[in-house]
Amino acid sequence: MAKRHKHYENRGSSGRGRRGGRAGHRGRGGRRRYAERNNSERAAPVWAGSGDLGNPEMVDDYYFGRQADRRLWKKDSMRMGGFRPGDMGASEQPQSHLPARKRPVTFTLARDVYDPSHNLNQLLNKQLDEGAEEEDSNSSSPSASGDDEPEGEYEPNPEPKMYRISELNDDALFFVDEQGKLPTKIPAVEVAQQETPRSVEFNDTLTVGKVQLQLRQDSNGGTFVDAPHAKRIFRDDLYGDVSEEEDEPETPKTEQLDNSKSVRTMQPPSPVPQLLSTNIGRLTLSELASESESDTEKPTAEAGAEPPKGEPGFGFLDEDHLADMSEIQVTNIRLGAAAHSYFVASPRTFGDSVARWVDHDTMVDIALELGLPEGRLHAYLRHVYEQLVPPEEPADDGADDHYGDENYDDSEEDEQDDEYENDGLIALVEHTLANDPYRNRDYNTKSLEYRGHGSRKRLIIDKESMIDETVRTLLEDKAAQRSAKRAAKRHAKEDYIAEEARMSSDLFRKYPYGFHIENIIDELEAFLVSPRAALEFPPLDPHGRRTLKNLACAFALICKQVGQSTHTRVLVQKGGRYEPDYDAVNRIRRQRRVFMRVDVRRPRDDITPREPRAKFHVREGAIVGGDAPTIGQDNVGRRLLEKLGWTHGEGLGVHGNKGISEPLMARVKKNRSGLRYTE
């Protein structure tokens, strides 16, 4: 073996490859090798010097580094310090090779300070400068001197004066709206219009029987019934124009106020909290009850409270007519636990006709402002409550009288009722049993018997029975109707199942008995465009399975058999190609057309019965057609021949060339003896 020279050692790889490339390049059996360097070789440490030439004590540090790091150097030499004087090791390792998540965060001081109000300040200063320029231009007047100024000489524009926001007054910065916001919704005020007098007399009262209706007339002359609102209070003047007696002295207004104030008496505060805190041990139930009753008393009258005994209702006293309460229209009320609220419209009080909710105290103030005496305030609120809240109907206690404490003994009444019900019942039963011969007779209650199945099912009725012909016919008709109804229900159910199976994707349900060749082709075409991956056909005979395989191959499908014996099925799967060969499909379509399933039997109704073939028995030597009748007179051909001159028994043809008059006879030959003479 020849010795290899040294210049071959670095070529290729050091392995067993025979034809390696150059050193450091790829070749057979070798790969590129790079010098592996660690982090210490990539970035050698640089020692920092922090000396200062102005300080004699730190000159050594400037050239040779800090005293603490000087021990790392081999020796103190000017050559080592002269490479980077003053900046020895000041540079740090570059961070470019580090990933972003490991790089240190650096903060940079912004050149300009961000001020959000800077633009606003500039805009305000610009507006102030423009206003100052306008004032200067208005105050300065044009020069009236006739001396023309030399061309080219002009006064320079004055520099704009800068203002600070802190030096401006509030009038320049803020706008005071002294006018206020205009109201968007102006309340409407109803103004009563005086009706113009008419020349025609109008009667505002219509009497229908015992009922009087108030009529009104509009501006157009139309008449209508003045029906009051369902929830509006209309106070009628019960006394009419009743004038007070002149002799009766008038009570001053101050006395009325004193009398009205006497109704509302202020009670001292209850000492119940003090008793509960100090004398809780000596407090009795009676004292607590009395104190609680005193607390529940209200200083003002409520609308739903019961009126004092003997107090007349609102409208029955002269004091009720001192104030015009028709100016208050109350259309609704909200009941509360402590006080009620009212839906009130009062143009005199509110200045408009808009209804609004007011509390109890406001309602009292409105009534008092109109001049209603305070003593009749309770009656007025009670009147409002009764007009708006329907009265509660008292419960009928008559139905619960038998639940009272008294005990009634009704045993005697029950005995009398039993005697009355049983009166004559025994005699009626005895008479019925004596005169009814069919009551105690036993009858055979067995079910009816039928014979036959399906449409030939008939009812069997014994002729020896006592049933007459009418009842027999009725029973037969009922039995036939019952059978027909059952058959109709069965057919409807079968039709429903067949319809559901027709829409199903399962071929076993869709084709319960067999296929036509067109059905198979349609199913394969639908399978190509459907998302299904496989299609299974019901069991067919061997020739049907072979035909199905040929069709599957024509449609570029994969076909295989599944199962055994009569349950052998054909499973069709999709392949990679979906382009059918319709020429092969049309060739198969012209072959066998019907394929029946071998795993099910057809019902008897679908089986068409075969007609029996007629059997003819002939004997040896019989004349063929010897028993056939002669052609009658009504035959068209015979009548045509007779018109041409032919007669019965005459041969056909012209004179001198007529045919035979007797036809040739053919005899039946069944044996194999050959031609021979037979008598």
From Swiss-Prot:
The keyword Ion transport does not apply. GO terms for molecular function: enzyme activator activity; nucleic acid binding. GO terms for biological process: maturation of SSU-rRNA; mRNA splicing, via spliceosome. Keywords: Cytoplasm, mRNA processing, mRNA splicing, Nucleus. Residues 514-576 form the R3H domain. GO terms for cellular component: 90S preribosome; cytoplasm; nucleus; preribosome, large subunit precursor; preribosome, small subunit precursor. It comes from the Eukaryota. The keyword Nucleus applies. Residues 1-40, 76-161, 242-315, 391-419 are annotated as: Disordered. Residues 16-32 have a biased composition (Basic residues). It is found in: Cytoplasm; Nucleus. Disulfide bonds: none annotated. Residues 146-156, 406-419 have a biased composition (Acidic residues). InterPro entries: G_patch_dom, R3H_G-patch, Splicing_assoc_domain. Residues 633-679 form the G-patch domain. May be involved in splicing. Belongs to the SQS1 family. This is Protein SQS1. It comes from Eremothecium gossypii (strain ATCC 10895 / CBS 109.51 / FGSC 9923 / NRRL Y-1056) (Yeast).
